[in-house]
């Protein structure tokens, strides 16, 4: 899992990376290079930061990670838990 500062450095360092906003059953997550963004306070077991809306996830990318590039949006299949919906 990536913290927000780590994600920001990663996106600045490698401009070819494109974040993915993963739409799960009742929330959205941001994935960069296969790693999820960690919440502000780590939980046990670790879970990705969850956003209630697509707009909130996109706003987080633009505001906190200062990212202005392309974004992939992928829906997760609730039966398999994968992005192959």
Label the model's feature ranges.
Residues 64-76:
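A short amphipathic beta-strand at an alpha->beta junction
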Residues 11-14, 23-24, 66:
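Flexible, charged surface loops at secondary-structure boundaries
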Residues 74-85:
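Intrinsically disordered, low-complexity charged/polar segments
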Residues 1-12:
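Negatively charged, low-complexity tracts enriched in Asp/Glu with abundant Ser/Thr
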Residues 18-46, 76-78:
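Short aromatic-glycine-(Arg/Gly/Cys) micro-motifs in beta-strand/loop hairpins
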Residues 50-65:
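A short, charged, amphipathic alpha-helix used as a generic interaction element across diverse proteins
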């Amino acid at each position: 899992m990536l913290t927000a500062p780590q994600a920001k450095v990663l996106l600045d360092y490698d401009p070819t990376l494109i974040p993915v906003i993963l739409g799960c059953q009742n929330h959205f997550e941001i994935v960069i290079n296969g790693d999820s963004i960690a919440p502000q306070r780590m939980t046990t077991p670790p879970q990705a930061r969850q956003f209630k809306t697509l707009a909130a996830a996109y706003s987080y990318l633009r505001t906190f990670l200062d990212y202005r590039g392309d974004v992939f949006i992928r829906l997760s299949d609730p039966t398999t838990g994968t992005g192959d919906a």
